[in-house]
Amino acid sequence: MKNIRNFSIIAHIDHGKSTLSDRIIQICGGLSDREMEAQVLDSMDLERERGITIKAQSVTLDYKASDGETYQLNFIDTPGHVDFSYEVSRSLAACEGALLVVDAGQGVEAQTLANCYTAMEMDLEVVPVLNKIDLPAADPERVAEEIEDIVGIDATDAVRCSAKTGVGVQDVLERLVRDIPPPEGDPEGPLQALIIDSWFDNYLGVVSLIRIKNGTLRKGDKVKVMSTGQTYNADRLGIFTPKQVDRTELKCGEVGWLVCAIKDIHGAPVGDTLTLARNPAEKALPGFKKVKPQVYAGLFPVRSDDYEAFRDALGKLSLNDASLFYEPESSSALGFGFRCGFLGLLHMEIIQERLEREYDLDLITTAPTVVYEVETTSREVIYVDSPSKLPAVNNIYELREPIAECHMLLPQAYLGNVITLCVEKRGVQTNMVYHGNQVALTYEIPMAEVVLDFFDRLKSTSRGYASLDYNFKRFQASDMVRVDVLINGERVDALALITHRDNSQNRGRELVEKMKDLIPRQQFDIAIQAAIGTHIIARSTVKQLRKNVLAKCYGGDISRKKKLLQKQKEGKKRMKQIGNVELPQEAFLAILHVGKDNK
């Protein structure tokens, strides 16, 4: 056990994490040169394309160090984006140390910071590495100081390397072996294995990535999942050298994969503990929590006959993604679809893109909403994830909205713009620290505002320099109202939105104006109204198309003209009673952009 090293790499997007892992795999001979390709560990096309890591992966490598010993390195790859922070914390819980990779040109960013603090809270040994030193813009001294200032770890002798050219990667490995402690644990004790990640394989069922904390797991053992109490047979187990290699046992301290013929990914929840059925551990490993979606949106197929295919596609995706939540929803305007819950906006985009790309579906998304906590007058607490589920105004005793704690890192020059943006988003400043010319800002901002377009606007006001990390803090009482859209007096459920009372007038007016441009003119007037309860706050009218009935009259008597106009008016009135308004697709997308253009 003393020769095992479990580590992961913490890095901001694009700081060279995947490239560094490619180099490490190459040096340790995990893959032959022929099989080597860029970003070995990012297995999804989307991961490659966006240059981000979404699912955790692991690799077991043998490294012959300069002291003559051969070490087993277990490298667990972690996602870097804020939406996947729970997956990061699971990956880190399986390690004893982490490499903090920072781009020597760009310096420390907010997400690096968030994950680094998670690692330090778990008492991991953090080893700083300065990457991309071959770039002309690299300034390793300044960045080393930045790491000491902002993160607070000693970086004077940080390893310098360039993953692209391979310079200094050997030093990274030596430092790894020297500084990161070997795993602790009792090889003779009852089995405790942490599930780092699970994914679905068409042939094997659910494959789980596990780290053995105590005891030993052998092929053919009966294992028990501690949170659900179900038992399974350990059919196959082994390690990744990125390729799957079968083994007969996994020893204490090792990281590997396990197949138990579980059909459903919820049977092996990420972060759960596995133990032996015949000799169970007394308690589960700490840190397991059910992942709760933060953002909800309705997804509807454009063609209603795609509904079945859509349902199957969601089912398949959720096999791989335990944090994706969905339930059927029907809307009078959009037909049948699903209400889906996501970890954040990036997660939502990725799921939507995967549905459209891998399953050939055309989808409409309704405006993303967050979960509100509503206390009704009968003192019962319910959680509302869509405007249509909100109880009537007179039944609500108190409505509480989720507040997110946002950590931002940005250059001083953009401080004013960013503070203005945060205040506009109803944010409350809780902390502000200067580090050289960087500022670390902490704000508490309502989740609904963060979800709408906060990230895009933050990037544009700071010219892309600001970085953001947010997490759910608490529910807080707030004066929120539901704005309904009525078209000719009929509510359109898919267009409703929940917003703060102060913004409701503006949001309502913008929405109505936007709809007016999008709804085609008909033979009769169309009234578009925004209402809070029964109180109308904005209205605009799409004018009717009318024929000039007086064209044939020439001179003519006034009473003759009046008669014709009156007749036309009655016809229009009759039309209006029976006419239906067809809403075009763009109308639903309009909601997504309310409040974006005019800023």
UniProtKB/Swiss-Prot annotation:
GO aspect biological process, one term: positive regulation of translation
Pfam families assigned: EFG_C (PF00679), GTP_EFTU (PF00009), GTP_EFTU_D2 (PF03144), LepA_C (PF06421)
Intracellular or extracellular location(s): Cell inner membrane
Catalytic activity reported: GTP + H2O = GDP + phosphate + H(+)
Family classification: Belongs to the TRAFAC class translation factor GTPase superfamily. Classic translation factor GTPase family. LepA subfamily.
E.C. number: 3.6.5.n1
Keywords: Cell inner membrane, Cell membrane, GTP-binding, Hydrolase, Membrane, Nucleotide-binding, Protein biosynthesis
Domain of life: Bacteria
Gene: lepA
Function of the protein: Required for accurate and efficient protein synthesis under certain stress conditions. May act as a fidelity factor of the translation reaction, by catalyzing a one-codon backward translocation of tRNAs on improperly translocated ribosomes. Back-translocation proceeds from a post-translocation (POST) complex to a pre-translocation (PRE) complex, thus giving elongation factor G a second chance to translocate the tRNAs correctly. Binds to ribosomes in a GTP-dependent manner.
UniProt name for this protein: Elongation factor 4
Topology term for the membrane: Peripheral membrane protein
Main localisation: membrane
A single GO cellular-component term on record: plasma membrane
Residues annotated to bind GTP: D14, H15, G16, K17, S18, T19, N131, K132, I133, D134
Matches recorded under InterPro entries: EF-4, EFG_III/V, EFG_V-like, EFTu-like_2, G_TR_CS, LepA_C_sf, LepA_CTD, LepA_IV
An MF annotation (GO) of this entry: guanosine tetraphosphate binding
Ranges for domain tr-type G: 2-184
Top-rank EC class of the record's enzyme: hydrolase
